[in-house]
């Protein structure tokens, strides 16, 4: 009811605030006997953590995860997996000036209206700091998916502000601070971000995330369609304002002869559907894109009101990402992993015995 748990069979409950003592999560429903490498969990957290480049927030958090339960001798036990990350670099004094103010485009006003009280320090529970635990849980899901079904999930930044990539080289993604697969675009992105920092402004981004080696049959029509649950998961990421599956909104301008993914005995000839038909996976790559809005915390003054309704100008202090999309790739990967694993387990439970004569090559 309170919206802090995600999933049906493979569930994740997170807790903690941006400037609290710690962040944590409980992962339940993990199959037993799966080899879980804590180093791989930490690796994904390191990809997301703040303070790694001048283009992201300068808050310095080690984000070292502690696995408290559910793993014994390197394998899942089938019991709840508890994980914890301590907050170590809070600077709550930076937010003293806005404790009675509503920052434009932030969750300050809506949290205040819903709960009648809000933790103004770094946004409290509404901060993207919480996504560290989604990444930790998603890293567990990734390992289960790869072990049981061979499914792999990875993503990249496909657009930074007005700069869109023109090619995808997976080897380049970890060679720059933007998760950008197009090396030719990196210098342009760097120059753009430097100018943006001098201006004191922010910008949005687009992330693409893909599950490869998918299996057909995942998804529970009518109300738990795979693409519907994926859109739900991705829209739940902080700052996300749009989700596309496959061709997405480009489908509006396509003719049916172009958009339909024709089939031969050797497989599908295209993947405009993004790997989902009728809410069920086809076995092709599952492809999604998310649009993230510009960061709302700016050093430039903006008009707002305080909790008494008085007009004010807000200037946000503190350390903030000039583009939240730069660190969003591992978060999007995590949410896709949680959705795919949850549906894979649900499919295995009800339809695991189903066999058909023919499978279209993915």
Curated annotation (Swiss-Prot):
Reduced FMN (FMNH(2)). It is an enzyme of class 4 (lyase). NADP(+) binds at residues 48, 54. Pfam families: Chorismate_synt (PF01264). GO terms for biological process: amino acid biosynthetic process; aromatic amino acid family biosynthetic process; chorismate biosynthetic process. Its cofactor is FMNH2. Pathway: Metabolic intermediate biosynthesis; chorismate biosynthesis; chorismate from D-erythrose 4-phosphate and phosphoenolpyruvate: step 7/7. Keywords: Amino-acid biosynthesis, Aromatic amino acid biosynthesis, FAD, Flavoprotein, FMN, Lyase, NADP. It comes from the Bacteria. Its EC number is 4.2.3.5. SUPFAM superfamilies: Chorismate synthase, AroC. One of its GO terms (cellular component) is cytosol. It catalyses: 5-O-(1-carboxyvinyl)-3-phosphoshikimate = chorismate + phosphate. Coiled coil: none annotated. FMN binds at residues 125-127, 238-239, 278, 293-297, 319. One of its GO terms (molecular function) is FMN binding. Belongs to the chorismate synthase family. Homotetramer. This reaction introduces a second double bond into the aromatic ring system. This is Chorismate synthase. It comes from Teredinibacter turnerae (strain ATCC 39867 / T7901). The lineage of its organism: Bacteria, Pseudomonadati, Pseudomonadota, Gammaproteobacteria, Cellvibrionales. The gene is aroC.
């Amino acid at each position: 009811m309170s919206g802090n748990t995600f999933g049906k069979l493979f569930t994740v409950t997170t807790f903690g605030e941006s400037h609290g003592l710690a962040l944590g999560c409980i992962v339940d429903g993990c199959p037993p006997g799966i080899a879980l490498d804590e180093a791989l969990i930490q690796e994904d957290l390191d990809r997301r953590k703040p303070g790694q480049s001048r283009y992201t927030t300068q808050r310095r958090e080690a984000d070292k995860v502690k696995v408290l339960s559910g793993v014994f001798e390197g394998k899942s036990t089938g019991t709840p997996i508890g994980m914890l990350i301590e907050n170590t670099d809070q600077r709550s004094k930076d937010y003293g000036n806005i404790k009675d103010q509503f920052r434009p485009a932030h969750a300050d006003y809506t949290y205040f209206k819903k709960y009648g009280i809000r933790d103004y320090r770094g946004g409290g529970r509404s901060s993207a700091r919480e996504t560290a635990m989604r990444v930790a849980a998603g890293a567990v899901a990734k390992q289960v998916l790869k072990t049981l079904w061979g499914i792999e999930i990875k993503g990249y930044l496909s657009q930074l502000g007005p700069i869109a990539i023109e090619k995808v080289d997976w080897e380049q993604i970890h060679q720059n601070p933007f998760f950008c697969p197009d090396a030719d675009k990196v210098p342009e992105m760097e120059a753009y971000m430097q100018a943006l920092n001098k201006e004191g402004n922010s910008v949005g981004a687009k992330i693409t995330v893909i599950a490869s080696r998918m299996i057909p049959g995942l998804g529970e029509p009518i109300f738990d369609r795979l693409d519907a649950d994926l859109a739900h998961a991705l829209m739940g990421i902080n700052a996300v304002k749009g989700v596309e599956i496959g061709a997405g909104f480009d489908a509006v301008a396509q003719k049916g002869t172009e958009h339909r993914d024709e089939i031969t005995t050797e497989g599908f000839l295209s993947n405009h559907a993004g790997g989902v038909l009728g809410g069920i996976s086809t076995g092709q790559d599952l492809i999604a894109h998310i649009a993230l809005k510009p960061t709302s915390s700016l050093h430039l003054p903006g008009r707002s009101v305080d909790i008494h309704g008085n007009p004010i100008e807000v200037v946000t202090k503190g350390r903030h990402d000039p583009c939240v999309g730069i660190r969003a790739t591992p978060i999007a990967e995590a949410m896709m992993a949680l959705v795919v694993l949850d549906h894979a387990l649900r499919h295995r439970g009800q339809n695991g015995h189903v066999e058909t004569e023919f499978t279209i090559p993915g």
